[in-house]
Amino acid sequence: MTNIISLSGGKDSTAMLLMMIEKKIKVDHIVFFDTGWDFPEMIEHIDKLEKYIGGEITRLKPKHNFKELFTKWGFSSFKNRWCTAEKRGAINKFCNQYKPFTQYIGFSFDERQRIKKTMGYCYPLVDWKVTEEDALKYCLDKGFDWGGLYEKYNRVS
């Protein structure tokens, strides 16, 4: 079984990755979907995280240009989820190269209602009862601060 980490770069997926490594859970691949529209601090965070873990984070690019999609479809929303569709499509294509696989998703214990009971997905932070607050504190204690983004915003990825 291939273990693939889906890394948004935010506090929850970062904490999940670091905790999995700390708990010696096998990590085969780490994928980050680079929209090209992320905060510069987020890209710096991904670079720093890559150095910290001493391994590669695969950076996936969108199939379509986001500026063109935005012009065509407008803001991504709950009803019009073109951004999510691009991200999921790219990540699923990557994962499907490594069947059988388990995809690890960084939903916190606070977000457990978002979980879909689908085979092939694992939500360690929910299993470990790690809240969003716990995840942020854990990351900050490890020296990850996203250049202060979490001081300004609740969500950064």
Question: Over which residues does each language-model region extend?
Answer:
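Nucleotide-activated chemistry modules centered on ATP-dependent adenylation/adenylyltransferase
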Residues: 1-157
